[in-house]
Amino acid sequence: MEKKRYYVGMRRFIILSSFIIGFVSFFISYNKKEDASLLDKLEQMMCRTKMNVHCDPFYGYQIHYPAFFEQVPDSLIHETGCCQFYFGNMLKIAQTAFIVTNLDGFTVRQGMEHFAMEQHATERRCGNDYFLLSGPLYINHRPVEGYRFYAKYVQRQKLWFVQSLSYPASCTRAVSRLIEQIDNWQVWE
């Protein structure tokens, strides 16, 4: 009889211990997920999300944007060939594509110097038919505190096809996938 009671007591102890360990493990892992910062969550979302493709109906260029970004309705954009996608959950991230007419007939290098000065770019890189600019974000010649921009200008005849990203400086690592997409952007794929 004493042997049976020993097994029953041991079984209760093992079941109770397993339940407590499972509960504590769940509680710890749940709290760790809550402790992940918004930037870490954004970075994970950017890495895992599907990229949607937008094809401009007038010019035919394509851009890739994260599936969780929202598109600004065409009715709010009055420029032909312009589109914008954004993520506005406390952090304001905007991916924009638009067309600029090259009325002055700038070469790629001249265009880079002109737009770099206009946008207060601190970094620039030039290719055969494109250039990349980045730096602190300015709107109406005033700096936007804590924000940066990254843009690619591609020259096609008398047009500049532009894809630009504006984002909080604290999100630089989180938007690295979008920056890489802009780096590799071909106007017509």
What is each of the regions a protein language model found here?
Residues 52, 57-112, 138-142:
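Secretory pathway targeting signatures of secreted, lumenal, and periplasmic proteins
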Residues 13-29:
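Hydrophobic membrane-insertion alpha-helices, especially the h-region
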Residues 69, 163, 185-186:
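Buried hydrophobic packing residues in well-ordered domains
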Residues 31-49:
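Ser/Thr/Pro/Gly-rich low-complexity linker/stalk segments immediately outside membranes or between
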Residues 108-173, 189:
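Signature of long, low-cysteine stretches enriched in small and polar/charged residues
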Residues 51, 172-176, 182-184, 188:
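Acidic/histidine-enriched, beta-strand-rich ligand/metal-binding domains
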Residues 46-48, 82-83, 125-127, 172:
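Sequence contexts marking disulfide-bonded cysteines in secreted/extracellular proteins
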